[in-house]
């Protein structure tokens, strides 16, 4: 019998990487001022974050099969928390960049391992309903991240944001240490090279990857540049944070439509078009 983790924990672990990405955006102006760097240099701390996050998704996915889900999750959270603490303490922009790389690499564990755990314990229509619930949580994440980031940036700049992230990471690490079960039943032997080759030959996989990539490019371009545009317009970080409401609304509507389609067993193509209207 499979041991099922708390669904609320799984929702939080999927939401946290999204919150981490968006909570940082309102403090880019504070980063530029505090470290005496240009806006473009401050924005690079987000660019390296996204690259390291993508690398982390691949590596943590492999390690989750090799080490198990629970130890992989704990190691990733430990790396993230340590890197965030360093980012909070440093006065060097170079160290900040390195800390951002390691924090992104670490927190990627929340995205990939959580989904792996869900696939361990759910299947079929039940799995689709669970992922629909997760989608609603993820769609709310940018709103929470932008709003919280705007308020923290206005109150205490980037150091207060990093302090909040470190505290959340510490709480999640302790909770996972105490409550997260190991859901891996067997350790599969996967020929990674053959799997990658099959994925690159699958037209549907490539189209889905392209769609996700285009969505993320559009969204993260706003996270990277929006704070500076608002500043040029005479608006502060707190006001920039409120713009996250508009960003999250479309994703939230799409997630609700997806859940409705799954409950009513609508045709997948029709569901796809309805969701992406938003």
Walk through the language-model features, giving the residues of each:
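C-terminal membrane-cytosol helix-exit motif in multi-pass small-molecule transporters
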Residues: 166-185
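Juxtamembrane intracellular "pre-TM" segments in multi-pass secondary transporters
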Residues: 181-208
């Amino acid at each position: 019998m499979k041991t099922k983790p708390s669904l609320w924990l799984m929702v939080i672990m999927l939401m946290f990487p999204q919150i981490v990405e968006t909570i940082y955006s309102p403090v880019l102006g504070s980063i530029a001022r505090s470290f005496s760097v240009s806006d473009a240099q401050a924005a690079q701390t987000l660019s390296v974050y996204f690259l390291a996050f993508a690398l982390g998704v691949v590596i943590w996915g492999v390690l989750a099969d090799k080490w198990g889900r629970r130890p992989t999750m704990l190691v990733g959270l430990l790396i993230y928390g340590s890197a965030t603490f360093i980012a909070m303490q440093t006065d060097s922009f170079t160290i900040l960049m390195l800390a951002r790389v390691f924090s992104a690499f670490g927190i990627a564990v929340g995205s990939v391992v959580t989904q792996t755990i869900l696939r361990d314990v759910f299947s079929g229509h039940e799995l689709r309903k669970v992922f629909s619930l997760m989608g609603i949580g993820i769609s709310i994440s940018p709103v929470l991240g932008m709003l919280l980031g705007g308020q923290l940036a206005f109150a205490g700049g980037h150091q207060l944001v990093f302090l909040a992230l470190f505290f959340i990471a510490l709480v999640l690490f302790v909770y996972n240490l105490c409550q997260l079960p190991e859901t891996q039943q067997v350790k599969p032997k996967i020929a990674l090279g053959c799997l990658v080759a099959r994925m690159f030959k699958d037209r549907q996989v490539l189209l889905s990857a392209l769609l996700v990539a285009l969505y993320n490019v559009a969204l993260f371009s706003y996270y990277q540049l929006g704070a500076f545009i608002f500043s040029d317009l005479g608006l502060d970080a707190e006001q920039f944070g409120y713009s996250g409401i508009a960003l999250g609304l479309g994703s939230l509507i799409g997630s609700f439509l997806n859940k409705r389609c799954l409950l009513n067993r609508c045709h997948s193509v029709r569901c796809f078009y309805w969701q992406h209207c938003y």
